[in-house]
């Protein structure tokens, strides 16, 4: 069974400690609030973020483009002999999922012995994070990439998210 890594987006709102402990790779999806841009590396404090939203400010996001996704995938594949499972931000909320599928196809042409499976979470925030959490549990229990991808595809429809 080939080793694989899990990639997800910063939209999962998973704690940084969890991400680091489980060696997850994060695709940074920047957001802008009141004219200032924030990233995974430079976030706005959570309390401040929600205080501003309660006061009427609305954040806007940027989707990942195929080049950014390809850069992330290639950096992983150059350093490791692994496949990639990417649990992506909802296709209903962003074009990032489609960008990641395009990037995965392009990168797999350069690395034909590797696989990149991109799963549309149909979720965001901790709904998406919950799917990542379960994928980590399944991986740690010895499930392979395909088994986890099937589980995600079958179970993502059982989430109920309120925005």
Where are each of the predicted segments found?
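A short helix-to-beta-strand connector/capping loop
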Residues: 2-3, 21-24, 111-115
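N-terminal glycine-rich anion-binding loop in soluble enzyme alpha/beta folds
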Residues: 5-70
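Short beta-strand segments
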Residues: 8, 88-90, 119-120
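Conserved beta-strand scaffold positions in the cores of enzyme catalytic domains, especially
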Residues: 26, 86, 116-118
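N-terminal glycine-rich phosphate/adenylate-binding segment common to multiple enzyme folds
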Residues: 68-97, 104
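Active-site histidine-anchored catalytic micro-motif
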Residues: 93-160
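Conserved small/polar residues in nucleotide/adenosyl-binding loops
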Residues: 163
